[in-house]
From Swiss-Prot:
Keyword terms: Calmodulin-binding, Cell junction, Cell membrane, Cytoplasm, Disulfide bond, Glycoprotein, Ion channel, Ion transport, Membrane, Methylation, Phosphoprotein, Repeat, Sodium, Sodium channel, Sodium transport, Transmembrane, Transmembrane helix, Transport, Ubl conjugation, Voltage-gated channel
One function term, GO molecular function aspect: protein domain specific binding
Enzymatic reactions: Na(+)(in) = Na(+)(out)
Source organism (scientific name): Rattus norvegicus
UniProt name for this protein: Sodium channel protein type 5 subunit alpha
Amino acid sequence: MANLLLPRGTSSFRRFTRESLAAIEKRMAEKQARGGSATSQESREGLQEEEAPRPQLDLQASKKLPDLYGNPPRELIGEPLEDLDPFYSTQKTFIVLNKGKTIFRFSATNALYVLSPFHPVRRAAVKILVHSLFSMLIMCTILTNCVFMAQHDPPPWTKYVEYTFTAIYTFESLVKILARGFCLHAFTFLRDPWNWLDFSVIVMAYTTEFVDLGNVSALRTFRVLRALKTISVISGLKTIVGALIQSVKKLADVMVLTVFCLSVFALIGLQLFMGNLRHKCVRNFTELNGTNGSVEADGLVWNSLDVYLNDPANYLLKNGTTDVLLCGNSSDAGTCPEGYRCLKAGENPDHGYTSFDSFAWAFLALFRLMTQDCWERLYQQTLRSAGKIYMIFFMLVIFLGSFYLVNLILAVVAMAYEEQNQATIAETEEKEKRFQEAMEMLKKEHEALTIRGVDTVSRSSLEMSPLAPVTNHERKSKRRKRLSSGTEDGGDDRLPKSDSEDGPRALNQLSLTHGLSRTSMRPRSSRGSIFTFRRRDQGSEADFADDENSTAGESESHRTSLLVPWPLRHPSAQGQPGPGASAPGYVLNGKRNSTVDCNGVVSLLGAGDAEATSPGSYLLRPMVLDRPPDTTTPSEEPGGPQMLTPQAPCADGFEEPGARQRALSAVSVLTSALEELEESHRKCPPCWNRFAQHYLIWECCPLWMSIKQKVKFVVMDPFADLTITMCIVLNTLFMALEHYNMTAEFEEMLQVGNLVFTGIFTAEMTFKIIALDPYYYFQQGWNIFDSIIVILSLMELGLSRMGNLSVLRSFRLLRVFKLAKSWPTLNTLIKIIGNSVGALGNLTLVLAIIVFIFAVVGMQLFGKNYSELRHRISDSGLLPRWHMMDFFHAFLIIFRILCGEWIETMWDCMEVSGQSLCLLVFLLVMVIGNLVVLNLFLALLLSSFSADNLTAPDEDGEMNNLQLALARIQRGLRFVKRTTWDFCCGILRRRPKKPAALATHSQLPSCITAPRSPPPPEVEKVPPARKETRFEEDKRPGQGTPGDSEPVCVPIAVAESDTEDQEEDEENSLGTEEESSKQESQVVSGGHEPYQEPRAWSQVSETTSSEAGASTSQADWQQEQKTEPQAPGCGETPEDSYSEGSTADMTNTADLLEQIPDLGEDVKDPEDCFTEGCVRRCPCCMVDTTQSPGKVWWRLRKTCYRIVEHSWFETFIIFMILLSSGALAFEDIYLEERKTIKVLLEYADKMFTYVFVLEMLLKWVAYGFKKYFTNAWCWLDFLIVDVSLVSLVANTLGFAEMGPIKSLRTLRALRPLRALSRFEGMRVVVNALVGAIPSIMNVLLVCLIFWLIFSIMGVNLFAGKFGRCINQTEGDLPLNYTIVNNKSECESFNVTGELYWTKVKVNFDNVGAGYLALLQVATFKGWMDIMYAAVDSRGYEEQPQWEDNLYMYIYFVVFIIFGSFFTLNLFIGVIIDNFNQQKKKLGGQDIFMTEEQKKYYNAMKKLGSKKPQKPIPRPLNKYQGFIFDIVTKQAFDVTIMFLICLNMVTMMVETDDQSPEKVNILAKINLLFVAIFTGECIVKMAALRHYYFTNSWNIFDFVVVILSIVGTVLSDIIQKYFFSPTLFRVIRLARIGRILRLIRGAKGIRTLLFALMMSLPALFNIGLLLFLVMFIYSIFGMANFAYVKWEAGIDDMFNFQTFANSMLCLFQITTSAGWDGLLSPILNTGPPYCDPNLPNSNGSRGNCGSPAVGILFFTTYIIISFLIVVNMYIAIILENFSVATEESTEPLSEDDFDMFYEIWEKFDPEATQFIEYLALSDFADALSEPLRIAKPNQISLINMDLPMVSGDRIHCMDILFAFTKRVLGESGEMDALKIQMEEKFMAANPSKISYEPITTTLRRKHEEVSATVIQRAFRRHLLQRSVKHASFLFRQQAGGSGLSDEDAPEREGLIAYMMNGNFSRRSAPLSSSSISSTSFPPSYDSVTRATSDNLPVRASDYSRSEDLADFPPSPDRDRESIV
């Protein structure tokens, strides 16, 4: 490979010539020859093992050439060059570079068979193609084309423009085809998928032009795809589209599951509601006799009943709407008023598109429910026509369908994004690794050169450096980041404070002095260094980098210290280095460690550590360097600015060819890494530099300098910041005070205020510029921001005289963002949004392209239809508001779909343009735009989100000026308080000594370590109200404010013994005064710190309102003495033991709750009644329990304690809570009519109150006040009981009707809250919520700030413009503006009293009203009316005109993007992160496990929970056994499943208006299925006998079959009184769950279902909490809104009159659906909308609402339910999805273990937990992957060394462990886990204990092999002996007498005996065949075969028996076995 590595620099660019092509062909031939010779298997395998060569990432086509290669010479730009990538050395390719150094790769084969790479035409085409102007031209053409396409009614001449565009696109494609070739080879035209798009666009253009294809506008729509060409032109967009396509691929499983679930729900809906929505209230009629069925009504006659029923004039309309009133015939459905009857008539609602009449419409309705679009309308229609009970169906669909499935889509998209991010990070790390290796090589070579004494000193000149600049945009963003984190202190030195990674970092002339030594180059550990090394978190910018040419790495900033390579010699003519040859130096790009000015002078920080900043440290590892707080700043450096003097080896050092070649090869590896240098080292132009020095840094004369110093002292003081912050808040308040109908004085005051604030901010800017100099002032982002706002404010002042420029006034609102400077959360959130918007730059572009394309498609396809058929959808004859006639309106419709509202506009579209096309377009926009792209937005938002920043944003120890100022104020106040107190005490007591002692005390440092002594009583009993422990007087060292004494650190959360506290105590208990003063003087003289109270306890005590909390008894103190460490000394104060000047340390509420002692603790005796403070003040509280009265009291307390602690008591109280809550539900509008119930409830109420008061008293006595009132849950009980008690007393005294008492009674609705503490599940959720409250409140506040800007803007734009004049007789529509122009005209025309000037109820008349309007817009409920009013508004108090102010839509679009998409989704982010944090706190185990360990742990966890089950025994009867075999086969299950699905299909075919024949056929098919399923049931029962009922699925099937049979027989009766029994068949679909396990391909769906199963327990808890919230709110609603007028969303069925109706309403608005409709009637305050004097049944008057209560009620409910509870639901699903995905990616899943045991049952039918060793091989083969070990598997199984017990049996756990280990791989961690799991298994299954293993499979194999070897040796020995003896005998017989004297070899023994016996009986010679039969002993194979032939013999027996088998005593056998 070495010869392929190209040299760096311009020498690497070689023209592509014919010789080059020949060389490539030669290399290809060589490669082929090599490939042909290496044919053997081994070499092929070896090649596979080697890493196949891959193309270099940084040399890919369309990437920028890496900087390492330098700038190509001008003459080579646009010319064919040899390919730089070694990968292509054996492929016919060449590259071309353009001016921007972008790489274009071409095929070197002939284009179009004719044009070779050297053909002039092709060369010209290539030159044109790579030129940047060419792509610019195409880009401009596309954009211009888009503008023309967006015209809805183009003039005739545009046709010629169209031809021009087509010509340009044709030219572009022609150039590409000529340059690249058409399609045969790589890199040709059609090999790029983006070119397919171009090609199809051109083909379509010509087709439509020359061929008449009918509907031209439809084909013209294809032109819009040209907009997609922008993606192919801008390379950055390609990555995004890649991510989108990836996420769509990942969505496949979710889509399948979604379609399946929706189909099931649609089927259920079809069965339940088919035809219901056509039931309407029809006017009564009479049928006329004697005619042909004609009917009469109201004196009119209709020809037939059908005609009458289809006449819309006969239907009753819903109040105030054009909707028909639906009704139903069931008891709880909607009813019709007098004169109407409920009949099935006419078409379905919403143009006939909302129905459950066929499967398709039902599916659409369910999809609409899932996306929650306008679902409240469907919900109300269905409940009205079918009955309220079906709310359950909607709950299931909303919670399982909508929340679960939609959020699964989010989870999958987020995960796809995350994976892509991880891949990018991995790729970058790979480059990093290669870079490190290259560094090592270079370092070694450099050391070698240094040792040889080569002169490596050289000058560096930047002009020769090839490092190209990074984009301006990136540099700016980095500067912004730096400045926002920097300090404002400019310092006096003349150096700008820029990091070395930012700003202009030109190294002009770096003096390079001494050579590099070894020591300077050794890598340093970061421990002793002034820098702390850390890896920067990987951001999300990599994937979505904004720069079009950026690679993934450019946006990673963890590569900041890199080696800048030296260029090699340019080969000059003489071969000597040219005069210009030089090398750039090595730059240490540390973060925050050096400053560089414009001239390139670099000063290093922290000069004390020479080694860290030594010139040689350019080879430091690439890390981000952080400066710890104690690093000195440049102005403090003793040595002043230093020069950076790096060392660079000269090129001459590489004169030897070997060294040079090595360096070359090393450098060539660096390509990818060096491309990612942080920034260019470009020098500022000297003229700018001089300009900055002269004009932007003002240091003219000493007088000016002193003025400047003084101004700086004032401006930089923390108090100045505090003042400015207060001004910002005040200014915001002033802006928020603007409202409609202001008085002149008020308006004037606001104007003066504005002038004042503008003056203040201008002055601040001016002073800061004076103090800092403009040069330094504008280095800070905040200052630039301030200056822009000030300039805009001044412009507004100047222009305000000219006219109403309220837009400029809106810019003042940006001042609110200045709060971010001192409000960390706001800062964090702005950063999050900034990061997302930055990362989303490209995604936004893609979304814009999608919106544009769909808007144009909609306009082209449907525009004409909207204008021609407008009468179908609009009564007024005007165009409807939502149409596609022009581009702007089409864009609005697409945007509305992205907001999730698609169904209503789709109905309109379907009405004018036909169903199929509209469905296709709208659902495409919905799925692509809303579900995928917007979820990608959300995924990005969540990924750039970190709750650490939100919950504890200021942990970096740097205090901002605001905190410093507040700390200073606090200190001042404390000083004033103390001196005042001392003064008063001195006068009162006349005790002069005390202050003196005190002074000594106060001067002591508060951090002296003191031995702990028991606290003096006074110190211990400081009342919490007086504690100052949360505040702190001083900061850390080095952060002191001016005028401080030496820094002192004060521990926080410690009961400090401040003097005033002690003296207050002395006042109260004079008896202990002497003792106290002694102890105090002891503390002072001994230098001891007062007793430190335990932190957690003091926190609890501070939060309670009693004075009790802080005390601890002597025993407690001794206990703490043992456990608590000593108070830390000053030097080692722990981080959390002092608060950095902050106003207060926030207590974590969740921790607090956990620290509150639970009442249910098992303590033997009650605690003290009172706190010790109370006892000291009132000695009478102290009772002596040893004496008589006290003894009785103590006994009483113990008895009470026993009662309260008893479990029955708690159960009784829970029962009473539930009863009392239930009683509240009966107090509805009808209570007055039901006298008995009313009386009963009154008595019950009293009884409950008594019970709860008694419970409270019992607990007081049992627990004592101290314990009772330090428990938050007890406080809750106490307050709720108080409410009941007060209302009871008021009733008794007759004050029940008083207003305050009435409103207090409604607080009884809080009773159910008492159940919270009693139910564990709910308590867990509440604790989690309470933990999240601080961050939720933070986000809520930030949202309010964000919204405040939009609200104020809304007030500026729309205040007073939402009014209109209406005529009451004509409904709520405004009159035409030509009739009534404004409010005064309306009032003057109002002669009849029927004209009213009214406002839209929700408006922008003030900031509060604006907030409500924005909430409706953000939740997309009621936003239409607000937008219509805004768009129609003309002027102040003027009559609106249709779409007069059209572009006001843009205000709402912008608000929806920032106010809704971002801010509302931040809630999800906060909640998810809180969950993760709490998990970290609780689940510590995971954090300390390696990934490997976790993998084993999870596998073992699953493993331990299983054990073998006894299978159902096979019947003995032959026929039963046969059936049993069939029934237990998997195929049988699959067949039945298939039949179930078929049954579902037949059910889907049903429709409401089907013909009688169809009904008949379906009934027969249904009977057939009933018969089949009955047959299945009978067959299974026959096979399985009584075991059939041991499986719950079988019982379920049995019930369904019985119901089906009963349903078929009694169908008429059942359908009349119940619902259709076919419904049960739908439930059968649940059986699909069983099949999913068997289908390996369904793994993804199994994961999703598994995630749901994991979520269920948590979701149940959240559901309970949600129910509780709904219950409480419904009680409140009944109390406040029962008599509100029926209009908008409130009617006879959905109202707050009864508990059930309230619950219907609240369930609906849980998803925020339709809350605007419910709120609307409550906002009515008087005529003409409601009547305040209407009498009600309970004695109250009026049907008006109370707006304040209503708004509070609905907004709090929406925030609690929609934003918190529902988002918790989402968080849990996301969390569990990621867990389930992790589980599914693990090698072994739960299913694998299930399958193992299922197969085990077949091998171990008795469930003994053992199988025979001989069956092991078959068992291993029978398993499914990944546990399966396919045959032949003997060797693998033997190697596992499985333990065997007697009887050659192996335990299932041993096998499972071994197989698991095989899958997961060897690991040391396995053994410990195995032991742990075995213990667990032993406990669960005692059967294994009695069997001790006697051998293992491996040892058994060893024994068998040993036995075989011994046997063979012995046989060989025997054979030799027998051969000898045989030959002797042969000779004896054949040889005659001469041999008779010969002795026999063996005279005795087995062989002699047998042979002699044989030969004595037989004299005939043996045949040759018998000789060969036993010549050789059995082979090794036969032994192993015998083993496998199921012989149940043990090893020891085995060897013996084989020996004997060879020599049986039978004579016949002997005869056969011997020669």
